[in-house]
Amino acid sequence: QMTVASDTQYEVTFRDVPVAATERVGTARGGWAVWSDVMHEGIILLAAQAMGGAERALEITVDFSKTRQQFDKPLGAFQALAHYMADAVTNVDGGRTLVHEAAWAAASGRPIAKLAPMAKLFACKTYRDVTAMAQQVHGGIGFTTEYDIQLFFRRAKQLQLSFWDDRYLEELVAAAVLDERRAARA
């Protein structure tokens, strides 16, 4: 059992469980293809969740930076913090577009072997980066359990670890890109 950000994960092991032929998913030795297809659709949903979290964490941070005063002016008036938030909103908007494209491709029956892992990689990295920046802008209160930003930060890490990790997603994207290159040369 592993718990990160209040999302408990369990492992279930089946041994010698009879399954009728009519109840089986896929063909004998063909389960990985079915599993992979389902996982690709699932990681698009996780990417959407990550982008929603990044967007909300950014909204909370922007509001905080407008109201929190330091040296008689709002935190958002400081150039360095404004640049952090500008970078964050750029990445959030770009990530949202990538996730929308992946979802559209999946819904349209188009190939998602590259788009789905790209969407999850980018969305989870964006979520993690936005929440790390948000904690910096919030200062000490951003790490306390009484304030929601810490939950967004923990959830970002949990989503990054869920389903396939960054390394495997990078391998999927690389394989898809290399396959495209080979097909273009043929």
Identify the residue ranges that each predicted region occupies.
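C-terminal helix-coil-helix/basic helical segment that borders enzyme active sites and/or dimer interfaces
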Residues: 62, 66-73, 89-122, 135-138, ...
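Glycine-rich phosphate/cofactor-binding loops in nucleotide/flavin-utilizing enzymes
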Residues: 141-186
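Residue-level signature of the cytosolic catalytic core of signaling kinases
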Residues: 27-28, 77, 108, 145, ...
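A glycine-biased, small/acidic residue-tolerant capping/turn segment at secondary-structure junctions
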Residues: 104, 127-153
